[in-house]
Curated annotation (Swiss-Prot):
Pfam short name (any one): adh_short
GO molecular function, one term: oxidoreductase activity
Binding, substrate: 170
UniProt signal peptide: 1-25
Subcellular location(s) per record: Secreted
Bias (Low complexity): 328-337
Record keyword Ribosomal protein present: no
Name of the protein: Dehydrogenase/reductase SDR family member 13
Root EC class: oxidoreductase
Entry keyword Zinc-finger: no
């Protein structure tokens, strides 16, 4: 009996340690008014993105849910309007796997929205699933698509300054190692998928770092945010069906709810006084140091140039000139199978070699304005 009680005690103690070190996220306690401001959140039809959009809507922002599925995106927009009491929540179609869709979204947004104060790159994938593309789908969705979208929306971000870009990354970036000779090569097999996912998250951190350098003095700041281990659709999406019933209870016990995962992205989007930390990586609502590979400025700049090529941006092409080369129907950016005519192929970009966690109790203390009723995140 004593051994049993000791075992139970050890298990409970272990769970408490896991809960307070991984599951429980520092809450975002303040509520700044965002009336008159516009935010775009990608992948906002579920999980962290939906919770992030909800908190922005509660603060009075006009929130654009940029999602691939029209049905799920419009349903999420309806839910968020009902829950937040804010009718300024809308859906716009965006498929980050298609550069044509990214360009079409940008055209539609720039033609209809006079402001962009917050851009949150939340959408992402952890596996290619059964899709077999002639490019690195994980890098395309998790980095290249967001890179192009940011580039195309920069004119609006600059005219709305001070404004912010938040790139949702992951602690997996610590395992990433970028090989610039194979950056966009197709991913085959689960081992390559794990490596490609970590690499895409490293690309997120380097992108935020270089973007901060590129935008210094413009009033646009950017941050990489780690939401923590979250019990979301991304976690279970690629788990075999027979295993999901077994993993769901475990995930509920040891992973954060999406609402908890939204706290650090919200902190990066809203916290006053962190502008001097533009380009840094945040976790648990505080800045966190990254490994050498994630603070390599030369690699960050090299990734920037490689990303321009992969996104179909020519030398010297600026954001304003990109707006002139959009698909003919900007209102329906939903075709993932119609590549932009200028998209380069992998062989063109990369010829063959022969041819040449400290757990902080820091909270998001955002000044409260009188326009909205206070609600904790």
């Amino acid at each position: 009996m004593e051994a049993l009680l000791l075992g139970v005690g050890l298990l409970l103690g272990a769970y408490v340690l896991v809960y307070y070190n991984l599951v429980k996220a520092p809450p975002c306690r303040g509520l700044a008014s965002l009336r008159g401001r516009t935010a775009v959140v990608t992948g906002a039809n579920s999980g962290i993105g939906k919770m992030t959009a909800l908190e922005l809507a509660r603060r009075g922002a006009r929130v654009v849910l940029a999602c691939r599925s029209r049905e799920r995106g419009e349903a999420a927009a309806f839910d968020l309007r009902q829950e937040s009491g804010n009718n300024e929540v809308i859906f716009m179609a965006l498929d980050l796997a298609s550069l044509a869709s990214v360009r079409a979204f940008a055209t539609a947004f720039l033609s209809s929205e006079p402001r962009l104060d917050i851009l949150i790159h939340n959408a992402g994938i952890s596996s290619c699933g059964r899709t077999r593309e002639p490019f690195n789908l994980l890098l395309r969705v998790n980095h290249i698509g967001p890179f192009l979208l940011t580039h195309l929306l920069l004119p609006r971000l600059k005219t709305s300054a001070p404004s912010r870009v938040v790139v949702v990354s992951s602690a997996a970036h610590r395992r990433g190692r970028l090989d610039f000779t194979r950056l966009d090569h197709p991913v085959v097999g689960w081992q390559q998928e794990l490596r490609a996912y970590a690499n895409s998250k490293l690309a997120n951190v380097l992108f935020a770092r270089e973007l901060a350098t590129q935008l210094e003095g413009t009033g646009v700041t950017c941050y990489a945010a780690h939401p923590g281990p979250v019990n979301s659709e991304l976690f279970l999406r690629h788990v075999p069906g027979w295993l999901r019933p077994l993993l769901r209870p475990l995930a509920w016990l040891v992973l954060r709810a999406p609402r908890g995962g939204a706290q650090t992205p919200l902190y990066c989007a809203l916290q006053e006084g962190i502008e001097p930390l533009s380009g840094r990586y945040f976790a648990n609502c505080h800045v966190e140091e990254v490994p050498p590979a994630a603070r390599d400025d030369r690699a960050a700049h090299r990734l920037w140039e490689a990303s321009r090529k992969l996104a179909g941006l020519g030398p010297g092409e600026d954001a304003e000139s990109d707006e002139d080369s959009q698909p003919e129907d900007p209102g329906t950016p939903s075709s993932p199978s119609s590549p932009h005519p200028e998209e380069p192929t992998v062989s063109e970009l990369y010829p063959s070699p022969q041819s040449s966690t400290d757990r902080s109790t820091v909270t998001c203390r955002i000044p409260v304005k009188a326009e909205l009723e206070p609600q904790a995140c």
